[in-house]
Amino acid sequence: MHRTAIFLTYRSCMRNFSTLSKTLTVSSGKVIRNGPFRRVIREKNQITKAPSVKAFKENSNSGIIKVHDPIATTILNEPTVIIERQIEFMNVFLGFEQANRYAIMDVNGNKIASMMERDFSITKAIMRQFYRLHRPFLVDVFDNWGNVIMTIKRPFSFINSHIKTIIPPSAYVDNGSDSTHYHDGKEGTTVGETIQNWHLWRRRYELFQKDGVEGSTFDQFGKIDAPFLSFDFPVTDADGKIMASVDRNWVGLGREMFTDTGVYVVRFDSQRCFDNIYPTEMLSSQVLTLDQRAVLLANAVSIDFDYFSRHSRQTGGFLSFGGGYDE
């Protein structure tokens, strides 16, 4: 009888604990997991189903970014773009952390845009020396005429980086000076975000798109799960099929050893960019929307900061085989 009473009491406690856990999961309203992918909720007490991803041609006008927007006509309409981080000589020879600069090119090597980390004050320059890999930053994407067409934002990250993709409301560059001037007002429209998913040796990210301009949810449309010291970062859908990728190209022993530079190939279109790279059966039939392409472009910057820059080194001038400084 004594053992029976203890067993019944144990079952009752476990049943109450299970009920309490379900109640807390629903009421917290932070993250709802549905199968392999998830949806991040910005409103409480809201339960949603797993997101669906439509083809780019069918969904090009339904997202936040439209086909005629500058970021689309300049970069995102390209099936493949190449990002090259500019050489940072002070970082290489003195270990001084400089603001990152990038050139964006098409597959023919023509420069179509650029990216530059905001560097407006001595305070931020000092912060870069202390925070290095974990530092917060704002990276602006410019067209060839100096207009800001997108902003990549990352707050301070102690472990996992969290990148936001933002379309600015309005901005212009004063061509008569070296500084960029921004109109007062709200920060801009968030298109999506990427969240690094910490793992002891693998390189993982989750990619989200915002559910409309006024939406409060972020739907996961892809994930990256690259192996240890990988140079290739394929983006897979919910079925594990490859829909896009960010790959770091080896640029030669001399440049890798004596400069702080990096070249990345961003492939947006699974139907046009992976000939002789992956077997057809490994490719997804889904094609990234403009919003999703903008998020992937920002994720390429996150990959560069997290794994291939020298930000976690105290001194420059050393070769980074795989760049896994934070592992």
UniProtKB/Swiss-Prot annotation:
List the subcellular locations: Mitochondrion
Cited Pfam families: Scramblase
Q: Which UniProt keywords apply?
A: Mitochondrion
- GO molecular-function term, one example from the UniProt record: phospholipid scramblase activity
> What superkingdom heads the lineage?
Eukaryota
- The name of this protein is Altered inheritance rate of mitochondria protein 25
A Gene Ontology biological process in which this protein takes part is: cellular response to heat
- Key word Mitochondrion present in the record? yes
Q: Which residues cross the membrane?
A: none
Q: Which family, according to UniProt?
A: Belongs to the phospholipid scramblase family.
GO CC annotations on file: mitochondrion; plasma membrane
